[in-house]
Regions:
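N-terminal secretory signal peptides
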Residues: 1-42
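N-terminal export leaders
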Residues: 1, 42-61
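Extracytoplasmic ligand-binding site segments that recognize negatively charged/polar headgroups
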Residues: 115, 119-127, 150, 165-302
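Bacterial lipoprotein signal-peptidase II cleavage site
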Residues: 63-71
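Mature extracytoplasmic/periplasmic domains
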Residues: 341-403
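Conserved C-terminal helix/tail region of periplasmic/extracytoplasmic solute-binding proteins
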Residues: 405-423
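Early extracytoplasmic/lumenal segment of secretory-pathway proteins
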Residues: 86-173, 179
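Extracytoplasmic/periplasmic substrate-binding proteins
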Residues: 272, 289-348, 385-387
Length: 423
């Protein structure tokens, strides 16, 4: 296996279709939403006009068909930004219908403060959304403490076990960290209203946490060197696929890759997983520092395919719209894992009502549209579509595992080391 850890690159961390060919789709990276607020008079249910595929202008430069609307709260008039201001910009956002789900304007006002342990934060995107909520609700403040999810999870557990945490909620980039806090009984169950919009597959046991944004494992591939039909639907077949010998890349040090291997271990067992890792290494799979660089190498033609979260291909396409890059998805195995960023209420907080309303805002139509079009995440509520022709969560076929079990990482690290693919 060739080691490419010294390559330069940016660190971006973070059911199959009835058609025999798997669903895939790419879309361009979306710009920062505008922060100015205007009054809304048009219906949130309107559709944006369709535009030609060659159009280059985003919503940010167009007349806004979704004017902002005011709500009454705490004796004051509050201004809710227009839907377009929650959206990113880009050609594939144009023509998107208004999302379904509950609008912010139909939710209780936020008032008070929350101490939020942010695990990850997707490059500041989550903080940006909190700032938008603070603009809507002058009486609300979200104080964030940003650190890696695993570190935050350990800090929360230690604080609760020693007498109490100063934080109210944990917003984690992955389910493994949420699962760790839940396993150690450092949480309080979320209210039913906060859980209701999200499918049970993306909730913790006993309502311990709820997903707010999803990401799917995928196989970015170079369309000039391989056909999608040549890519197996099971990762177990990759080591023996001739077209992929010596032409694939991965990033074993990356947290998302470790979760992928953990999912395989939980589903197939440690020995089968070790053998697969060794087979992929022996097949010449090249090592890279992160999955963004893997995806760049695929687009460059340096690799035929790789293993990466779905949104890295979207970021590459933003920079290089004509890059010969697309996505394939495996079926029913670890290669099809859908992980989530989610929210957990920390044991000992006395802000139950505010936390419930805060989580409901994260699952609002506007928030889910924001996460889908700005961070390219999979929406967690049925009424919002993923961007760019990606298969919906329902069309993907992830492995049947409890996402919280991804927190059991130590055995994964041991077998990766034994296989010569240390993280």
């Amino acid at each position: 296996m060739t080691d490419r850890d010294d390559r330069p690159g940016r660190d971006a961390e973070g059911k199959t279709s009835a058609n025999p060919g798997r669903n895939h789709g790419l879309f361009t990276y979306l710009g920062k939403p505008k922060s100015n607020m205007t009054r809304r008079s048009a219906s949130r249910r309107q559709f944006l006009g369709a535009v030609g595929a060659g159009a280059l202008g985003g919503l940010a430069g167009c007349a806004n068909p979704f004017e902002s609307e005011t709500t009454e709260g705490s004796g004051e008039e509050l201004s809710v930004p227009s839907l377009a201001q929650f959206r990113g910009s880009g050609t594939l956002v144009e023509g998107r219908p208004a999302p379904g789900g509950t609008s912010i304007e139909d939710l209780p006002d936020l008032s008070g403060s929350l101490n939020i342990y942010m695990g990850g934060g997707e490059g500041g995107i989550y903080e940006r959304f909190i700032e938008m909520l603070e603009e809507i609700y002058p009486e609300f403040t979200g104080f964030t403490d940003d650190a890696p999810s695993s570190s935050q999870a350990q800090s929360i557990v230690e604080a609760v076990q020693s007498g109490g945490s100063q934080a109210d909620v944990f917003w984690s980039i992955d389910a493994a960290s949420l699962g760790y806090v839940a396993e150690n009984d450092a949480y309080e169950p979320l209210a039913a209203e906060a859980l209701e919009p999200v499918p049970e597959d993306f909730q913790g046991a006993d309502g311990s946490w709820v997903g707010v944004a999803g990401r799917a494992r995928s196989v970015p591939y170079n369309t000039e060197t391989i056909e999608e039909s040549e890519i197996p639907e099971k990762v177990a077949e990759f080591p023996e696929t001739a077209a992929l010998q010596g032409t694939m890349g991965w990033a074993p040090t990356y947290g998302a890759f470790k979760s992928f291997v953990t999912a395989m271990r939980l589903q197939k067992g440690a020995e089968t997983t070790r053998q697969w890792l060794e087979s992929m290494r022996n097949a010449g799979t090249e090592r890279y520092p992160n999955e963004y660089v893997v995806t760049q190498a695929v687009a460059d033609g340096e690799l035929t395919a790789g293993f990466a979260n779905h949104y890295y291909a979207m970021r590459v396409k933003n920079q290089r719209p004509d890059a010969p890059l697309d996505l394939a998805f495996t079926s029913g195995d670890a290669g099809a894992l859908v992980n989530v960023a989610g929210i957990l209420q920390i044991e000992g907080t006395e802000k139950d009502a505010l936390i419930t309303d805060f989580v409901r805002h994260l699952l609002s139509a506007e928030a889910q549209e924001f996460f889908a079009t700005v961070s390219y995440a999979y929406p967690m509520i049925p009424g919002v579509e993923p961007v760019g022709g990606l298969p919906t969560v329902d069309e993907l076929n992830p492995p049947e595992i409890d996402l919280a079990d991804l927190s059991d990482l130590e055995p994964t690290l041991e077998l990766m080391s034994e296989a010569g693919v240390s993280g």
